[in-house]
């Protein structure tokens, strides 16, 4: 299973480089088309007010990528990265993409992940490659 990922500070890129999975980086300058199943790994940059939470503009490339030529139709699941110190907006972008496209949020980790996180994502990818089924549950 291929990983499609977006990295702002390099944390997500460092995580992906620790896996043995094929991958492609989402950048603001590309129109990247996916024609095979993939897992999306996205960090979260969001703002929160008393009435609304939303991803900030720096995350637009993730939303653009998912919409481009219906890439979202090939996405088998979403993995969120973030910092738990941000409490209510921890992995918010992953939750927002999951809800928008009704794609399961499958896993989350902090910063650039631990060896256990790498193993868990590789196992998850292998299970999906072997036909494991997952169901959507709205994370918001």
UniProtKB/Swiss-Prot annotation:
Recorded family membership: Belongs to the NrdI family.
HAMAP family recorded: NrdI (MF_00128)
SS bond partners: none
Protein's recorded name: Protein NrdI
Pfam family, one: Flavodoxin_NdrI
Function field: Probably involved in ribonucleotide reductase function.
GO BP field: protein modification process
Molecular function (Gene Ontology), one example: FMN binding
Lineage: Bacteria, Bacillati, Bacillota, Bacilli, Lactobacillales
Organism for this UniProt entry: Lactococcus lactis subsp. cremoris (strain SK11)
